[in-house]
Swiss-Prot record:
Example of a GO biological process term: sporulation resulting in formation of a cellular spore
The encoding gene: LAE1
Assembly information from the UniProt record: Component of the heterotrimeric velvet complex composed of LAE1, VEL1 and VEL2; VEL1 acting as a bridging protein between LAE1 and VEL2.
Name of the protein this chain belongs to: Secondary metabolism regulator LAE1
A GO MF term: methyltransferase activity
GO cellular component annotations of the record: nucleus
Species: Cochliobolus heterostrophus (strain C5 / ATCC 48332 / race O) (Southern corn leaf blight fungus)
Role: Methyltransferase that performs automethylation. No other methyl-accepting substrate has been identified yet. Component of the velvet transcription factor complex that acts as a global regulator for secondary metabolite gene expression. Controls the expression of the T-toxin gene cluster. Promotes oxidative stress tolerance and acts as a virulence factors during infection. Negatively regulate mycelial pigmentation and controls sexual development, as well as asexual development during vegetative growth.
Reactions catalysed according to its record: L-methionyl-[protein] + S-adenosyl-L-methionine = S-methyl-L-methionyl-[protein] + S-adenosyl-L-homocysteine
Amino acid sequence: MTSNGLPVPAQNSNYMENGRWYHGFRRGLYMYPCDEPEKDRMDIYHQFFAVARRGQLHQAPVPSEPHLQPRILDVGCGTGIWAIDMADKYLNAEVLGLDLVNIQPEKIPPNLRFRVPRDYESPWTLGEDSWDLIHLRMACGSVESWPELYQKIYTHLKPGTGWIEHIEIDMEPRCDDYTLPPDSMLRKWYGWLADATQRAYRPIAYEHRTRQLLQAAGFIDIQETVIRVPYNTWPNDPHQKDIGRWYNLGLTEGLEALTFAPLTRVYHWDLNAHVRPIVEGVRRELCNRKIHAYNNIHIWTARRPQQ
């Protein structure tokens, strides 16, 4: 029996924990649920990124000549929403999405396929030297070794013309006007989350050595774009306000998903006595427009050289 009195599930079946459904494939390695609220959160974040990037689906180049058939790989595709949009945009492309869990829709464009369950930290059998674009978004918290993952991506891109595009949110709270106190629940929450996921060998903290790691893997033409994302609608700038509206929705809807497993599995904290009050304290601060705090999106693009 599990801790909440349910039968122990089969190895690859979904199971209930703290009121949320988690997938059984590579059981326990991945900290985040696979239920309907989590699918909604992923799709909210897709819209959030679209707003933050002013509608831009990708930054790295994709061959658009009619006689070419670009190959696009989405690693950790989630609900598949980005892959679907790319397949719709590039009708002559071959698009493939990989994920640990089967939460993608059945009705998809004819030039799109999904391979699930697939753990992208396991060996790949996807065709080396054959992809034009490999896309990775919001992977912090599910990667044990960035050097190994970047090396896999490098070897699977076409020499000379293949690009990686990697998008992450640095979730460490930032504030330039001291309206976020040093002892805020938001800062404490992030500290606990960063520590717990580090102990689980899949840190949610943003990897600040990304440029060096991409260089070490062999990439060239490395470019970084940083977009500030406020926690709510506190900025005066209309675009920043719109970003904050979507980011607040994604964060507040996903607080339980981000918090429950790390703090109960790693720290063994009681869900109702300890973890839920933390979540509610963080939620209040995220929605407080008097707190002028933000995170940063980091968008990395890089090319595999010919030699």
